[in-house]
Amino acid sequence: KYMAPFSPTDVLEEYTRPVRILRSGIMDIVPAISDRHIIEVPGYGEMEGFLTDGLRSLIETLPSSDMYEYTVRWPGHIQRFIDEVEKGTLDHETIIQEWKYDEGTPEFTWLMVEAVSENNDVMAWNVIDEGGKDGHSMARTTGLVTAICTEILIEDENVVPPGVHPPEALPDYAVSRIISEMKSHGVVIEGPEIDL
């Protein structure tokens, strides 16, 4: 059973909004929930990945020839969504109730970032959280970043110039602190260490 850890309306939009990707250095727009495939999630088993439009600012700020974001769900979840859309039986109010978060149900958040160099060297990182007494996993993995960034900005208002900035504009010391503090709160971050 899927539980939306944030607004179900936003999840539904994620499943329908056209997807921006980079392919051979060129931005392309492809249909949402395309390129479906099975992904083995260590410790959790098989899940299904599909393209969604989550690259946001990265597509403009991170030099890359190819860049994609896949959302991962339990097998069968997205097919049920597709079937209901095709039959015309998708009801937003029903979905909001069915996807309501249940604190008694075990859940987890998993993120994998994979970078492939021009020489085909691969580096990969995994972020895993199963929630805890201080909140569910998605709240922890996103909220901790926000809270730590806020602390950094309070301590040093010049960390970035005034204005709106993407997360990747943060200086290296801020990124190192975010990673360190997330780990100290029990969020598992695995992968090669990078000197920042």
Predicted regions and their residues:
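C-terminal catalytic/substrate-binding lobe primarily of soluble NAD(P)-dependent oxidoreductases
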Residues: 1-196
